[in-house]
C-alpha cells in the first residue's frame, strides 16, 4: 500500500518554512489504518514484547491497538502533569525550549521488554527521552516503531542501538 498517498502535506504549518506531515488523513482511511497496524504487528510479533509504550499523543493511537494485537500491555508516556501517581521524568530539548516526558513509576516491572511507538520521528529528542524513561524503570528497551521518519533531521542518530521500524520515509 502507498502510505504516502494517505498522508497530507501541509506547507507552512505550524510555522512558515515547515512542511507538516498530517497523519489524520491516514487515520480516517480504514484500509490504511488497518495496514499500518498489521505491518507493525508483522514486524514485532515474534519479539516477545511485554509492553508497548506510546508517546503522547499520536503514539497512543498506534500503540494501543498494536499492544492489543501483540498481547502486550500499553504504557502511556505523557506530557508533564497528566499522571496521578509518582512518575519518572526525562527532560529533552525542543527547537524552541525544553519539554518533559513522564511515566508512572509502577508502569513497568524491571527487566520487561518494551517497544516505544510514535507517529513520527524528526529530530529524535522525544523518542530519546522516552528511551530514558524505560531505562529509569530498569526495563529492556527492545526498539522503536514509527509510522513516518524525516530522514534529513537524522533523529535515529540520537537513539540507542536497538531495532527501529519505520513504514514511510521522507
UniProtKB/Swiss-Prot annotation:
GO biological process: adenine salvage; AMP salvage; purine ribonucleoside salvage
Enzyme class: transferase
GO molecular function, one term: adenine phosphoribosyltransferase activity
Biological pathway: Purine metabolism; AMP biosynthesis via salvage pathway; AMP from adenine: step 1/1
Keywords carried by this UniProt record: Cytoplasm, Glycosyltransferase, Purine salvage, Transferase
This protein's record includes keyword Transmembrane: no
PROSITE patterns attached to this UniProt entry: PUR_PYR_PR_TRANSFER
Cellular component terms (Gene Ontology): cytoplasm
Documented EC number(s): 2.4.2.7
Primary location class: cytoplasm
CDD domains: PRTases_typeI (cd06223)
Reaction(s) catalysed (UniProt annotation): AMP + diphosphate = 5-phospho-alpha-D-ribose 1-diphosphate + adenine
Subcellular location: Cytoplasm
Domain of life per record: Bacteria
HAMAP family in alphabetical order: Aden_phosphoribosyltr
Protein family: Belongs to the purine/pyrimidine phosphoribosyltransferase family.
Protein function: Catalyzes a salvage reaction resulting in the formation of AMP, that is energically less costly than de novo synthesis.
UniProt subunit comment: Homodimer.
The protein's name: Adenine phosphoribosyltransferase
Organism annotation: Thermosynechococcus vestitus (strain NIES-2133 / IAM M-273 / BP-1)
